[in-house]
Amino acid sequence: MPHSALFAATLSAFKAQSWVFREVPGMEVIEADFEAHHTKVPLHVQVYGDPNIASVVARASTTVPKTHQIQVAELIMRTNKELNLGNFELDWDDGVVMFRVTNIFPHGHQDERILASLVHAAIAEIDRITPFLGEICRTPKGELILLRVTDLMKRQDLLPPAPASE
């Protein structure tokens, strides 16, 4: 089965960035692992050729115990409220936190820069939330009632450093 133009552009974008990736056989899917400031970020890019949609999903390396899911759900909800692009999700059954960003491209206009930007955004957002997830998950179960997510989110020491200007 031939690749869609959008998947070809996605492959080209990954190659242009010199990113190491794996193609999933029989699907228009790329998987990759990125080293970010706080964590390693597994990433999944799926292309839907006919509607010309690319969906990028990055996964947090921290699995959330059921005992801590309410506080993590609050963190995600409050974080999503501030986002302009994409959203965080919590798989309630598995305790997996993901960041998903999707773009619908006009037919005939598969922009590799946009594809690379979607990947960068997903990695950056997972990296940004990772230390906050860690703080929640390290809180002993009996102390969760004392944890104020709004106060946790104000902690600047948990944010990665701002990128150096070029």
Task: Indicate residue ranges for each PLM-predicted region.
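Terminal, regulation- and interaction-focused segments at domain boundaries
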Residues: M1-S12, R59-T62
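Ser/Thr-rich, low-complexity intrinsically disordered terminal regions
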Residues: S12, Q17-V41, V45-S55, S61
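Glycine-rich, often proline-containing surface loops adjacent to acidic residues and nearby aromatics
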Residues: P51-V57, G95-V101
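A generic structural motif
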Residues: A60-V64, N103-Q110
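Short, internal acidic amphipathic alpha-helical interface segments
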Residues: A60-V96
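Long, hydrophobic, amphipathic alpha-helical segments used as structural scaffolds
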Residues: N84-N87, I129-K141
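Long, contiguous binding/interaction regions
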Residues: V101-N103, H109, L115-D127
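Short, highly charged C-terminal tails/helix-capping segments
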Residues: G134-S165
